[in-house]
């Protein structure tokens, strides 16, 4: 056998669920709480710094399920003003609430609800809400609210008003006859005097109309016109109107609700007089409405402006439209209706409502100085530079700045749920199809906007896709797991490139994922679920030509992840531990600007521990020689408690900086106990928190025939002597080894023979007990069991030294003899009858033979008695400790500075193994609060190709 060595250059390729024979060098079976970095190697993730428990403005902790199923959002005003908030669901006949906390201090913000704005928060799930933040305003959309229009005016009655306008020169009227017919009654003929003026003619006609005595009719003179209104018993009443006069019988312009053109409009009228201008009687599309604005806001001279139809809804119901959460000051917000602009011109044909009327709005977005909306298969954008204006400014002309309302026009049922900007336009996402909205000649306008489909991928409609800079990522859910895809748009005439980036971890990501976020700066995406402690990451690195790193890994946090947000190198998380909600953040750099510990070389670190925070107080108990370090949150009983002393030795002053101890908690869970130390003298430097595991499970090692490591020689004989790891800035390195067939401790039993007895001395065939000396373990998860060398899981602990098997594992039959029959059947199946035993009246007997099938025949008939025959299979039961052995790495001789922080910038550690490669599993495992940085590994061993040459 040849003595060989090979190198694995790095462990940056992350998790792969492929067989070990197909894994590339650098891929691993599992990576928990790691963070791959092309510069630093595979590092232990940063710890999360405790900011605050989430409280109300009154200082009361949120507990239990108060914030469950909430919609979380993040607001970044500037570098120093950041907030994290949530919207709770409608429950117990009460609307939801908005809660916001300062992301840097944890202070609860004051939320003011303007008017009845809180009624908008009627969503029953976090999936009902969308939050779109720009500067100091967050637009909140509830997709359970159906959009309605304001009611149409009821005071308009057609033909209940009329106008008589004298037109032309006075000479065309002097000496000519005038008459008016109102409601079927005609006035007496009137001939204007040769020297009559406009006033005289109108005054006389007004007198003649009044003489008709028509009920409810009022005549008012305005300049050169008469205005007629009819109101009977407070109700506007229609009437007919006609008139003739002048040299051609047409010196009276007569109209009621509409006029043929603008020239018919009188220069004097009453304030808010509305007339329809009918440019063409064949088409309604060119109609518009004019309203008179009197100079004195009453009647007389003034001007005409374009207006809305007198019987048309003025716009949308603001209470049903998206609302806004406005940041009005430090830690203060107001939730209010948005001042949506009303429709001020046109009607439902010439200036229609947005297409989301009668439907719901799924999402809002900003693009090119417009506010956009997604509603079913429609995309609606506001007027340019007027985000709250959803109607055209004029019904007479169309401009490029008018609102845009377009439909996807797909043959598939489509409900748009997300939108992302791309170089070519905007990418629209629905569950089964994706589209692009664009314009050929620049910005989107009502005339130039187009939509066309670009792909037909199936995706989740409850988790929005994310923009990672050069491409988009989205997920697709199956009944049992999640697939992750990358989409890179191409040119307008090309389909996007779509890659299944999650194929290598197929069935690894759980189906309950409800949050997907991205860090463009750090080139990763992250997925989490409100019901899980795990966050799944996918990180890449490209040099501009090719992708040099693709890595899947997972973090496990100290509680279920309710929310996470990424802001440059900071990651904020809200987690739920039991009944408490905590806000924490982690800095993703290994050398943060503000560090807790600095060694003599100036290297800065924050501890790799979760919920680390300054102890709220530190007291020393001189009698018992111990320090009490009080914690600022409810104690987590399932975590390892850590106390660490902060400080710096960079100035040459050596103190307790970096001192670390695994502390016990008091019975009430209010403080950690450090024995033998008086930490009250350095109370401001005492930090408390919880350890978390860095766990890198390495695949089986193979001799690689190809330089790039893609050709595993899995038929050879390879014995690994040792592994040598090159590590960067690291504290304690830990390793675990599991060897096939080697158990830390075992206890063997014959079932139905070595079992326990109850208080009355009766055998309990399901219970098996051992002594602590036989099986000593730390965690019950280490205890395993096998029956006939087959692993079983159907057992429960009755105590620390006793388990109870499930009844289904027992092969037994109880029968009754009658003193005559000798042939009996047992009801279980076995491969061999060698271990079948029989007891009669509790005494084992061999006075029988196997009669074929599942029958036995007694030589002497068993006596007549109930349940006196017991047939069973005496299986072999083994209870054992399946333990990973902790290996102590061997370090080369070196020097270190006494009393300094225990950090090495670079070293090599050796792990002795001396096992065949298929006989062991190796894990890099540590829960130390100090960093870990793994660069590469070289293994040494003996390789034999088994007498065959590889070609």
Language-model features, listed with the residues they occupy:
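Tryptophan-centered short beta-strand motifs
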Residues: 108, 258, 264, 270, ...
């Amino acid at each position: 056998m040849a003595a060989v060595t090979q190198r694995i250059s790095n462990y940056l390729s992350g998790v792969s669920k492929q067989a070990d024979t197909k894994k590339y060098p650098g891929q691993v079976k599992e990576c928990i709480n790691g963070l791959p970095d092309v510069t630093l190697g595979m590092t232990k993730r940063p710890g999360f710094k405790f900011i605050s428990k989430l409280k109300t403005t009154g200082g009361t902790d949120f507990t239990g399920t108060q914030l469950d199923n909430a919609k979380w959002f993040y607001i970044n005003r500037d570098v120093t003003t950041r907030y994290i908030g949530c919207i709770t669901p409608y429950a117990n006949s009460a609307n939801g609430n908005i809660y916001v906390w300062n992301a840097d201090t944890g202070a609860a913000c004051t939320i003011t609800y303007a008017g009845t704005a809180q009624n908008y928060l009627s969503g029953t799930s976090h999936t009902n809400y969308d939050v779109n933040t720009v500067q100091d305003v967050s637009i909140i959309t509830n997709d359970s609210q159906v959009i309605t229009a304001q009611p149409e005016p009821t005071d308009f009655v057609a033909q209940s008003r009329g106008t008589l306008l004298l037109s032309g020169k006075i000479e065309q009227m002097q000496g000519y006859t005038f008459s008016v017919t109102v409601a079927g009654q005609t006035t007496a003929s009137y001939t204007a005097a040769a020297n009559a003026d406009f006033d005289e003619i109108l005054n006389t006609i007004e007198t003649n109309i009044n003489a008709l005595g028509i009920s409810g009719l009022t005549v008012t003179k305005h300049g050169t016109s008469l205005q007629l209104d009819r109101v009977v018993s407070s109700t506007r009443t229609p009437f007919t109107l006609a008139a003739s006069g002048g040299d051609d019988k047409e010196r009276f312009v007569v109209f009621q609700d509409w006029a043929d053109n603008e020239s018919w409009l009188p220069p004097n009228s009453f304030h808010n007089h509305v007339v329809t201008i009918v440019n063409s009687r064949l088409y309604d599309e060119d109609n518009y409405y004019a309203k008179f604005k009197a100079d004195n806001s009453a009647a007389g001279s003034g001007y005409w402006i374009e207006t809305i139809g007198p019987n048309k809804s003025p716009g949308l119901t603001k209470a049903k439209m998206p609302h806004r959460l406005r940041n009005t000051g430090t830690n203060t917000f107001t939730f209010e209706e948005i001042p949506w602009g009303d429709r001020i011109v046109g009607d439902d044909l010439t200036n229609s409502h947005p297409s989301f009327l009668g439907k719901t709005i799924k999402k809002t977005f900003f693009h090119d100085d417009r506010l956009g909306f997604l509603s079913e298969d429609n995309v609606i954008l506001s007027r340019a530079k007027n985000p709250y204006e959803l109607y055209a400014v004029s019904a007479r002309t169309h401009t490029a700045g008018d609102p845009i309302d377009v439909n996807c026009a797909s043959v598939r049922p489509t409900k748009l749920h997300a939108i992302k900007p791309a170089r070519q336009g905007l990418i629209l996402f629905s569950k089964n199809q994706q589209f692009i909205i664009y314009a050929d000649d620049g910005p989107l306008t009502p005339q130039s906007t187009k939509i066309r489909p670009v792909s037909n991928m199936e995706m989740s409609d409850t988790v929005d896709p994310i923009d990672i800079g050069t491409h988009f990522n989205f997920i697709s859910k199956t009944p049992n797991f999640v697939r992750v895809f990358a989409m890179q748009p191409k040119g307008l005439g090309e389909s996007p490139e779509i890659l299944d980036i999650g194929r290598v971890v197929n069935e690894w990501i759980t189906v309950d994922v409800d949050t997907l976020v991205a860090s463009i700066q750090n080139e990763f995406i992250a997925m989490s679920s409100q019901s899980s402690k795990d966050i799944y990451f996918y990180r890449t690195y490209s040099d501009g030509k090719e992708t040099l790193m693709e890595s899947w890994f997972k973090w496990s946090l100290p509680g279920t992840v309710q929310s996470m947000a990424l802001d440059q190198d900071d990651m904020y998380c809200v987690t739920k531990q039991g009944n408490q909600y905590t806000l924490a953040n982690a800095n993703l750099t290994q050398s943060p600007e503000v560090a807790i510990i600095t060694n003599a070389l100036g290297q800065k670190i924050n501890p790799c521990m979760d919920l680390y925070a300054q102890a709220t107080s530190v007291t020393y108990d001189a009698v018992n020689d111990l320090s009490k370090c009080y914690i600022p949150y409810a104690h987590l009983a399932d975590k390892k408690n850590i106390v660490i002393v902060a400080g710096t030795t960079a100035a040459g002053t050596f103190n307790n900086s970096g001192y670390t101890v695994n502390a016990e908690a008091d019975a009430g869970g209010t403080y950690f106990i450090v024995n033998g130390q008086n930490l009250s003298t350095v109370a401001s430097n005492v930090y408390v928190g919880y350890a978390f595991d860095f766990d890198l499970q390495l695949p089986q090692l193979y001799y690689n025939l190809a330089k790039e490591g893609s050709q595993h020689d899995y038929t050879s004989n390879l014995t690994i002597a040792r592994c040598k790891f090159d590590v960067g800035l690291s504290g304690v390195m830990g390793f675990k080894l599991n060897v096939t067939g080697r158990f830390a401790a075992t206890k063997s039993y014959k079932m139905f023979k070595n079992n326990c007895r109850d208080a009355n001395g009766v055998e309990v065939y399901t219970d098996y007990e051992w002594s602590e000396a036989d099986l000593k373990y730390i965690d019950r998860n280490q205890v395993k069991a096998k029956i006939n060398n087959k692993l079983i899981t159907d057992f429960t602990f009755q105590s620390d030294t006793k388990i109870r098997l499930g009844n289904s594992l027992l092969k037994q039959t109880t029968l009754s003899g009658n003193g005559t029959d000798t042939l009996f059947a047992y009801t279980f199946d076995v491969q061999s009858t060698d271990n079948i035993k029989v007891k009669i009246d509790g005494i084992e007997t061999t006075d029988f033979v196997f009669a074929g099938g599942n029958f036995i025949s007694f030589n002497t008939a068993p006596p007549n008695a109930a349940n006196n025959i017991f047939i069973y299979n005496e299986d072999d039961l083994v209870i054992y400790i399946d333990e990973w052995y902790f290996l102590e790495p061997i370090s080369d001789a070196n020097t270190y500075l006494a009393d300094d922080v225990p950090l090495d910038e670079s070293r090599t550690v050796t792990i002795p193994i001396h096992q065949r490669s298929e006989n062991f599993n190796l894990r890099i495992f540590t829960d130390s609060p100090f960093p870990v940085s793994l660069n590469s590994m070289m293994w040494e061993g003996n390789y034999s190709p088994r007498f065959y040459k590889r070609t």
